[in-house]
């Protein structure tokens, strides 16, 4: 439906998204993020698998909490479809909508934390080989943890609005 609306706006001069013709540009933003946001969460899943393989192999241990890691990856993929509007806190969403997207976004921190702590537990007490792939994986863990912590802050719609258009968001 969204692509049809966009194509008719561009080719047949309809005004689904043009406010001058009674359209709603916020609707376009919802449609954009509804597609674009889950994509990001799905695209990171193979990267998680690569990090798990590197950490496990170069620590000489099995992945800690393997079943929990699988469930965490599935829940991240599913929850990614439910949080698109956390990129839209400044467009005038009502309080109840912002509260839902705040809570749903914060919930993603749980499976993400499971993954981080499982990777750390996999390395703990292992025979770690400090070669380039492992150093990359450890750097990823550090940056992903910082991104996750700043993401929890930005999940709060009130703080997100205050921090909008700042380097804090860029750093996240």
From Swiss-Prot:
In this record, what's one Pfam family?
Answer: COX1
Q: What class of enzyme is it?
A: translocase
Protein name listed in UniProt: Cytochrome c oxidase subunit 1
Similarity-based family: Belongs to the heme-copper respiratory oxidase family.
Binding positions for Cu cation?
Answer: 37, 86-87
Q: Where in the cell is it found?
A: Mitochondrion inner membrane
EC? Answer: 7.1.1.9
The residues listed in the UniProt record as binding heme a3, with positions renumbered to this chain, are: 172
- What does the entry list under GO cellular component? mitochondrial inner membrane
Q: How does it sit in the membrane?
A: Multi-pass membrane protein
The record lists the catalysed reaction(s) as: 4 Fe(II)-[cytochrome c] + O2 + 8 H(+)(in) = 4 Fe(III)-[cytochrome c] + 2 H2O + 4 H(+)(out)
Matching entries from InterPro entries are given as: Cyt_c_oxase-like_su1_dom, Cyt_c_oxase-like_su1_sf, Cyt_C_Oxase_1, Cyt_c_Oxase_su1_BS
- The UniProt feature for the cross-link 1'-histidyl-3'-tyrosine (His-Tyr) gives its location as 37-41
The organism encoding this protein is Ephedra major
Q: Which pathway does UniProt place it in?
A: Energy metabolism; oxidative phosphorylation
């Amino acid at each position: 439906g969204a692509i049809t609306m966009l194509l008719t706006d561009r080719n047949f001069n309809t005004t689904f998204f043009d406010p001058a013709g009674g359209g709603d540009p916020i609707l376009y933003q919802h449609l954009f993020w509804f597609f674009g946001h889950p994509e990001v969460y799905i695209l990171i899943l193979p990267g998680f698998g690569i990090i798990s393989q590197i950490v496990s192999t170069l620590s000489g241990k099995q992945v800690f909490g393997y079943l929990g890691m699988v469930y965490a990856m599935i829940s991240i993929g599913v929850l990614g479809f439910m949080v698109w509007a956390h990129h839209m806190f400044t467009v005038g969403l009502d309080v109840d909508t912002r509260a839902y997207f705040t809570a749903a976004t914060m919930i993603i921190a749980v499976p993400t934390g499971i993954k981080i702590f499982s990777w750390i537990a996999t390395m703990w007490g292992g025979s770690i080989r400090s070669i380039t792939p492992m150093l990359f994986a450890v750097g990823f863990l550090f940056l992903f943890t910082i991104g996750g912590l700043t993401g929890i802050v930005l999940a709060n719609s009130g703080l997100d609005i205050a921090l909008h258009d700042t380097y804090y968001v860029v750093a996240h």
